[in-house]
C-alpha cells in the first residue's frame, strides 16, 4: 500500500507502476490465451474435453514461435490446452505457475488427439484479443479478453452470460493512472523520482530481484539462443572486453534468453511484456551495482526507468510493428543516466539519441530472437547515456528527432501508431505464409 498523504499525482504514478509492473510466467501473449482458457475451464461443468480459441492477428504473431514454460513446445495451442487443464484462473499473468507434470502431459495428449484449435478472429478490430471456449460434451464456457493481457470483458456458458464488462465511467469516478500519466511530462516524472519518500517506492526493488534470478538462470546457457552465456564465454576467451558495457548486455540478454526459452521462472513485466520489464530493469541494476548504489538510489532509478517506459509505451498500441524493447530501453537509459548524472538534460539527451538510433526496429513476433533485440536495445541505451554525459546527442536537425524530447517521443509513437500499421500487416502475412 502507498502513503495516502502523498499528493494525488504521485499516488497515480505509483498506481500506474503497480498496474503495469507485474510478475509474468511465460511470454504474455500466449499467457493471455492460457488465462482465458483457465477462466473458461473454471466456469465449465465437468472436465475439459475440447478447446477452441480465436485470437487477433497481433496476438497470433506473438504466439507462433515462443516456448510455453515447462512444456518444451512453442505456440498458442499448447498454451490454450495447458491453461484449460492446468491453469490457475486467479493467478493473472502467472496462470501457469501451478501447472503439474500431469497437467502438461494431459495438455499434450489433448493436442495429439486433435482436440485443440486456435484460429485468427475474423473480423477483428482489436489489437489484443483472445477468446477461449472449452467443452465438456454439449456443455461449454467461453471467456474473452480484450485490450490488455488480463482484461476479461466477457464470460459466458451454455446457461447464459456470467459477466460482461461495461466500459462506461461512472460520474465522479477517478481517471485511470495511465490516463493521468498520459498528460504528464518526463520532467514531472523526474521530480517525483527525486522527491517521493523512499518508503513509498521500496516495493519496486522486488522487480530487480525477480529479473536478476531470471538473468542468472539464463547464464546457465541452456535457454533460447543463449546470447548472454555466449557473450560471457567470449569475454573469457578475450574476444570481448569484460567491462560495464558488456555486463549490461550480457546480463540483460541472459534474462531474455531464459524468458523466451521457456524457463519456469517469472519475469517482472512492464506494460504487459516480460521482455520490456527485463529491458527496463536489468541495465539499471548492472549500472547501480557498478557504482555501489544503495537500495534507495536503485529504487529511484528503477522507478524512473519503469515510469518513463510506461509513459512512452502508453502512447503506442498495446501491440504493434515497433519492437517495444526499444521503448523500454529508453526508460533504462533514463534510469542509468539518473544514476550517473541525475540531470534532466542528460536524461532527455539519452532518450533523444535512443529515438535516433533504434526506433526502426520491427517486432516480428515473440521468439528466442527477442533476446537479440533486447541486447541491441540495452547496448544502445548505455551508448546514448555515454554520449549524453559528454553533452552529445542526436539533435532536432536529424530525422524524426525533435529539439524537445517530448516531441521526439510523440514523433516516434505517431510513426508506430499510424505509418507502421502496413508494416505490421506485412509481417503477419509473411509469418502466416511460413506457418502454412
UniProtKB/Swiss-Prot annotation:
It comes from Shigella flexneri. Belongs to the UPF0597 family. This is UPF0597 protein YhaM. Pfam families: SDH_alpha (PF03313). GO terms for molecular function: L-cysteine desulfhydrase activity. One of its GO terms (biological process) is L-cysteine catabolic process to pyruvate. It comes from the Bacteria. InterPro entries: Ser_deHydtase-like_asu (IPR005130), UPF0597 (IPR021144).
Amino acid at each position: 500500500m502507498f502513503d495516502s498523504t502523498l499528493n494525488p499525482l504521485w499516488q497515480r504514478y505509483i498506481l500506474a507502476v503497480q498496474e503495469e509492473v507485474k510478475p509474468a510466467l511465460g511470454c504474455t501473449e500466449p499467457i493471455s490465451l492460457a488465462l482465458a482458457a483457465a477462466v473458461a475451464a473454471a466456469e465449465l461443468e465437468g472436465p475439459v474435453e475440447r478447446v477452441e480459441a480465436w485470437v487477433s492477428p497481433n496476438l497470433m504473431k506473438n504466439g507462433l514461435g515462443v516456448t510455453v514454460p515447462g512444456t518444451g513446445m512453442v505456440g498458442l495451442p499448447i498454451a490454450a490446452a495447458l491453461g484449460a487443464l492446468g491453469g490457475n484462473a486467479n493467478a493473472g499473468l502467472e496462470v501457469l505457475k501451478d501447472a503439474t507434470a500431469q497437467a502438461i502431459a494431459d495438455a499434450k495428449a489433448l493436442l495429439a488427439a486433435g482436440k485443440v484449435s486456435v484460429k485468427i478472429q475474423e473480423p477483428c478490430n482489436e489489437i489484443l484479443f483472445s477468446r477461449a471456449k472449452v467443452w465438456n460434451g454439449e456443455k461449454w464456457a467461453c471467456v474473452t479478453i480484450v485490450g490488455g493481457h488480463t482484461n476479461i470483458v466477457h464470460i459466458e456458458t451454455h446457461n447464459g452470460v456470467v459477466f460482461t464488462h461495461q466500459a462506461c465511467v461512472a460520474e465522479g469516478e477517478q481517471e485511470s493512472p495511465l490516463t493521468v500519466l498520459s498528460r504528464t511530462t518526463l520532467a514531472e516524472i523526474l521530480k517525483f523520482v527525486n522527491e517521493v519518500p523512499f518508503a513509498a517506492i521500496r516495493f519496486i526493488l522486488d522487480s530487480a530481484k525477480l529479473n536478476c534470478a531470471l538473468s542468472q538462470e539464463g547464464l546457465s546457457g541452456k535457454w533460447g539462443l543463449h546470447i548472454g552465456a555466449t557473450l560471457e564465454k567470449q569475454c573469457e576467451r578475450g574476444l570481448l572486453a569484460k567491462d560495464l558495457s558488456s555486463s549490461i548486455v550480457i546480463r540483460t540478454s541472459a534474462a531474455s534468453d531464459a524468458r523466451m526459452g521457456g524457463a519456469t521462472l517469472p519475469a517482472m513485466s512492464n506494460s504487459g511484456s516480460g521482455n520490456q520489464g527485463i529491458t527496463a530493469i536489468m541495465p539499471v541494476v548492472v549500472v547501480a551495482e557498478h557504482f555501489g548504489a544503495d537500495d534507495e538510489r536503485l529504487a529511484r532509478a528503477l522507478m524512473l526507468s519503469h515510469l518513463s517506459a510506461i509513459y512512452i509505451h502508453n502512447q503506442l498500441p498495446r501491440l504493434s510493428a515497433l519492437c517495444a524493447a526499444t521503448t523500454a530501453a529508453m526508460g533504462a537509459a533514463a534510469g542509468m543516466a539518473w544514476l550517473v548524472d541525475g540531470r534532466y538534460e542528460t536524461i532527455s539527451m539519452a532518450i533523444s539519441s535512443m529515438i535516433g538510433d533504434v526506433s526502426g526496429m520491427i517486432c516480428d513476433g515473440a521468439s528466442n530472437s527477442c533476446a537479440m533485440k533486447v541486447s541491441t536495445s540495452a547496448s544502445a541505451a548505455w551508448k546514448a547515456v555515454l554520449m549524453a554525459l559528454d553533452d552529445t546527442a542526436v539533435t532536432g536537425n536529424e530525422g524524426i528527432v525533435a529539439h524537445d524530447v517530448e516531441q521526439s517521443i510523440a514523433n516516434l509513437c505517431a510513426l508506430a501508431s499510424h505509418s507502421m500499421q502496413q508494416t505490421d500487416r506485412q509481417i503477419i502475412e509473411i509469418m502466416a505464409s511460413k506457418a502454412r
